[in-house]
Amino acid sequence: VNALWQKVNREMVAKILAELEYERTLRAEPVSADYWRISMGNATWQFSATRGIWGWLHIDPDTLTTASGAAVEAENALLQLATVLEMSDAQTAEHMEDLYATLRGDMQLLQARETLDADALIHLDPDELQCLMRGHPKFIFNKGRRGWGLDALRLYAPEYRGRFRLHWVAVQRDRLVWSSDADCDINALLSSAMDDAERERFDARWQELDLDDSWLPVPLHPWQWQQKIAIHFLAQLARGEMVELGEFGDEYLAQQSLRTLTNASRR
């Protein structure tokens, strides 16, 4: 695990330096052929790198060193950057939270790919392969998932390849706006999300609550229900304008955007 920790830290520091140098927040100075340094306040980072065709500095993470001899850790780089950019304590804390969440996700990715060689990756199911990709190449903390704890990450983050069902609620039609393609109606939506057995269970729940055509079923991400809808729409739930149905239907696999889900039951 320590080897993975060192690797993701080196890769993160390289990404921070390269991205902010490209955006001209930091300035790289050539030391010799293919060897550079970047200063952040009183700290200096040195590394081997080549300048790409679009100006991007491709840093070799394994060559990163600090002038002080300190360990190569992304936390130190962020604290140095906070001084340079004059971040407030609150801003630094928020970025630190996103940093550590991203490092955890990157470690999980490395662990998930440990036993996969190039041939295995080529033959991997495309949706499974999506889960093993590194995410946005330029967004530095691309796995921040602010508000997600370890349980939520294991359930819903793509690198964990967890499968989950949607959480459904019913909402009175006059309380929402229904918008869809001409060839898609509510029955088509339900058919795309649950098999016959699940549809029977869903219909039984619908009838149990005495719901009729004046209501519409709405699918929700389970985290969205737990953390947002059940709390921020408490008034609608209390007044009976929204009714919780529960989890129904097929299992889904999260893609890189988190909000994009692949139906894992029908592949």
Give residue spans per PLM region.
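Nucleotide/phosphate-binding site architecture used for ATP/NTP-dependent chemistry
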Residues: 1-267
